[in-house]
């Protein structure tokens, strides 16, 4: 049921998981292996000094996908809440496919621009002396012309290098999408509890966070990535056992 919810709806929250450090490994290994990145596995979502990512602060985060500057961004993300007794810090989720479907039906010209315009995503990582760059459209389709990916993160948008004649059209469409992705009609707001595993399709569901007061208590999540192939492979196997 967990994998079905992830595959068909893009989001699922597991309740009452153990809250021991790194215990997410014991749960996720029942699906498959996790995907390693320069953030390490698990990555610690906690307020730390000298962070190399805004997630490692107490600041609010705009709705985004993770690692848009990778050629293939992680397919799924799992955020395991170990403790959350700080004031604020509510989580936000948005079904990006629902938003771009709304955009397509109500603002077709903007949709077309975002489908066809390549965008520069950049990550400058001082901790590994690396600059990661990727050019991809914000919206991509699969071989059936169904939505395959939404690639969106304000924090990692690079300077646009498209033709000047395209610039105004692109930014007009981009602002429209940005507004919709933070429209309360499409947002789900919730507070993570210790033992929750917030699981979602990282290339469909955008996530964000409200600001929290790091002096009021602790908020510690551990994050894991997994490729789409692993989720689909395990789901195919299970469904074949129970046709």
Task: Describe the function of each predicted region.
Residues 1-243:
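Active-site environment of non-heme Fe oxygenases that use a 2-His-1-carboxylate facial triad
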